[in-house]
Amino acid sequence: MASVSQAVRSLFLKEFVNAFFLSMRYFFKQKATVNYPFEKGPVSPRFRGEHALRRYPNGEERCIACKLCEAICPAQAITIEAGPRRNDGTRRTVRYDIDMVKCIYCGFCQEACPVDAIVEGPNFEFSTESREELYFDKAKLLANGDRWEREIARNLAQDAPYR
């Protein structure tokens, strides 16, 4: 009896028809993926991407060389050298380096910063061809901040009620 049932199923190609209808059902549904890099999905305001140093609206850099980000970094990826105190009593960094090879994108540096100087921006497309390009110095970090400032400020404003 089992062989007759199997012969009938194979004669009418039941498995093929079931598979075909299953494929057609998914063919007409909305796609679950995007055609990256031509389309990009939504990015959360809390996304932790490429690091950036921010400036005040008058152009002065925000970092006050408190070194809290360097102290809290679990990967020890941040190196800061502070310059001498200025006449008004504030300090600024002479050297601010981040080794992105070591960085684990935990966001502790951003949370520790009292003036929101170091942030993890919205950029997730920063592939490189050499390892040396992943050592960010102060100039590169400030350039990232200048490039992404509008989006960074918007993301921080959206996240402000939860901080």
Curated annotation (Swiss-Prot):
EC number(s) recorded for this UniProt protein: 7.1.1.-
- What's its membrane topology? Peripheral membrane protein
Organism, scientific name:
Allorhizobium ampelinum (strain ATCC BAA-846 / DSM 112012 / S4)
The name this protein carries in UniProt is NADH-quinone oxidoreductase subunit I
Keyword annotations from UniProtKB, A to Z: 4Fe-4S, Cell inner membrane, Cell membrane, Iron, Iron-sulfur, Membrane, Metal-binding, NAD, Quinone, Repeat, Translocase, Ubiquinone
Identify the InterPro entries for this entry.
4Fe4S_Fe-S-bd, 4Fe4S_Fe_S_CS, NADH_quinone_OxRdtase_chainI
Location (main, coarse): membrane
Tell me yes or no: is 4Fe-4S among this UniProt entry's keywords: yes
Which residues does [4Fe-4S] cluster 1 bind? C63, C66, C69, C113
Q: Which family does it belong to?
A: Belongs to the complex I 23 kDa subunit family.
Q: Which reaction does it catalyse?
A: a quinone + NADH + 5 H(+)(in) = a quinol + NAD(+) + 4 H(+)(out)
| Positions of the 4Fe-4S ferredoxin-type domain | 53-83, 94-123
Broadest EC class assigned to this enzyme: translocase
UniProt function note: NDH-1 shuttles electrons from NADH, via FMN and iron-sulfur (Fe-S) centers, to quinones in the respiratory chain. The immediate electron acceptor for the enzyme in this species is believed to be ubiquinone. Couples the redox reaction to proton translocation (for every two electrons transferred, four hydrogen ions are translocated across the cytoplasmic membrane), and thus conserves the redox energy in a proton gradient.
Superkingdom of this protein's organism:
Bacteria
Annotated cofactor note: Binds 2 [4Fe-4S] clusters per subunit.
Bilayer-crossing residues are: none
Q: How does it assemble?
A: NDH-1 is composed of 14 different subunits. Subunits NuoA, H, J, K, L, M, N constitute the membrane sector of the complex.
HAMAP family hit by this protein: NDH1_NuoI
GO cellular component labels: plasma membrane
GO biological processes: aerobic respiration
Binding-site list for [4Fe-4S] cluster 2: C73, C103, C106, C109
